[in-house]
Curated annotation (Swiss-Prot):
Protein name from the UniProt record: Argininosuccinate synthase
Principal location listed in the UniProt entry: cytoplasm
Top-level division of the source organism's lineage: Bacteria
The gene coding this protein: argG
Top EC category: ligase
Catalysis: reaction(s): L-citrulline + L-aspartate + ATP = 2-(N(omega)-L-arginino)succinate + AMP + diphosphate + H(+)
Annotated GO biological process: argininosuccinate metabolic process; L-arginine biosynthetic process; urea cycle
Native species: Clostridium novyi (strain NT)
Length: 402
């Protein structure tokens, strides 16, 4: 009986040719596993295509609920962003996909897992570190680091030579990754950084200049940092994100053109659409401004950066990341309330907030009289706060005189 390999299967170019290649070079039974994290695909067709391409069996795992509630929502609570711009759409999905691949491997008794990630990308690290973190006994096959196919153009040629249908041509060569959170576009004419990206590549969003002329208002209600209601209607995390994607897309929200520092050492360019996620991050951050004590908020900003780096680098299952989750969950106990936003042609503006945990008190913050704040107290505070700088200036003047 042949040994088995579980292939992370998408039906796209890379994994479509990988089934044929694995059977040709390793003589393994290929168990395809397609993990549904919200990508816009016909999964019945993917099942047919996997079997037609030579897979022995195909699993389609619908994990959208888990993806949003256990992965994306953790990122939102952390305000996790990579290099100030990237909302980690691909990075959030990879550890969950790795987890499902390991589960299928255990179920099938497979010793191998195969992925179609290139040897220059971050995803090979994310998948393999995730897999070894969950089961170090599983061996990983990474064709892009082994075979003679050196480019996506070569992959198209291989597919055509072997009669494998792929949804890519040499003329339209963008590499895309889509899930419920985002879609990314890489490769092709984007590799020349002199080129402005073409807005006709957009899938989730209209260009801001072509967005509707009317302003959109929305309200998002959070409990312990997690979005629970949209416009006062309670919804599941998936429903909230789907609605926000639609609203954000109509208003041209959430497109970035990013030149990022990859984990593997090079810079790469990608265009990312994250309409609903951009809105969710904005609303959540505004509520943190309102409800968090200053020192907690400032420290959490440092944690957010580190958290984003850990997720980007594929360290979702690391002790440090899990420890930061515990800290973040503690900070989110006060992040309760409703944020109203105004959306217009790519812009997000705050249009009001309320929270039972608000640390803003109008009677204190107002320029008018207050029983809680005596203006005279400011003089002593300023003297003490400025004392080190006053002493420093005195010493410098004294030294100059001497």
């Amino acid at each position: 009986m042949k040994e088995k390999v579980v292939l992370a299967y998408s039906g796209g170019l890379d994994t479509s040719i990988t089934i044929h290649w694995l059977k040709e070079n390793y003589n393994l039974d290929v168990i395809a596993c397609c993990v549904n994290v919200g990508q816009d695909e016909d999964f019945d067709e993917i099942k047919k295509k996997a079997i037609k391409s030579g897979a022995t069996k195909i699993y389609v795992e619908d994990v959208k609920d888990e993806f949003v509630s256990e992965y994306i929502y953790k990122g939102v609570k952390a305000n996790a962003v990579y290099e100030g711009k990237y909302l980690l759409g691909t990075s959030f999905a990879r550890p969950l996909i790795a987890k499902k691949l390991v589960e299928v491997a255990h179920k099938e008794g497979a010793k191998y897992i195969c992925h179609g990630c290139t040897g220059k990308g971050n995803d090979q690290v994310r998948f393999e570190v995730g897999i070894m973190s969950l089961d170090p006994s599983i061996k990983v096959i990474a064709p892009w680091r082994i075979w003679n196919i050196k480019s996506r153009e070569d992959a198209v040629d291989y597919a055509n030579a072997n009669g494998i249908e792929v949804p890519v041509t040499k003329e339209k060569i963008y590499s895309r990754d889509q899930n419920l959170w985002h879609i990314s576009h890489e490769g092709g004419d984007l590799e020349n950084i002199r080129n402005e990206h073409k807005t006709d590549m957009y899938c989730m969003t209209v260009p801001p200049e072509k967005a509707k002329d009317e302003v959109s208002y929305i309200k998002i209600t959070f409990e312990k940092g997690e979005a629970k209601k949209l416009d006062d209607v309670e919804m599941s995390p998936v429903e909230i994100l789907e609605k926000l994607n639609k609203i954000g897309g109509e208003n041209g929200i959430g497109v970035i053109d990013l030149l990022e520092n990859r984990l593997v050492g090079m810079k790469s360019r990608g265009v990312y659409e994250t309409p609903g996620g951009t809105i969710l991050y904005a609303a959540h951050k505004e509520l943190e401004y309102l409800t968090m004590q200053k020192e907690t908020f400032h420290f959490k900003q440092m944690v957010s950066q580190k958290y984003g780096e850990l997720v980007y680098n594929g360290l979702w299952f690391s002790t440090l990341k899990e420890s930061l989750d515990a800290f973040i969950d503690k900070t989110q106990e006060v992040v309760n309330g409703t944020v109203r936003l105004k959306l217009y042609k790519g812009n997000i503006m705050v249009a009001g907030m309320e929270s039972p945990n608000a640390l803003y008190e109008e009677s204190i913050s107002s320029f008018g009289a207050s029983d809680f704040y005596d203006h005279k107290d400011a003089e002593g505070f300023i003297n003490l706060f400025g004392l080190p700088y006053k002493i420093n200036a005195m010493i410098q003047l004294k030294n100059q005189e001497n």
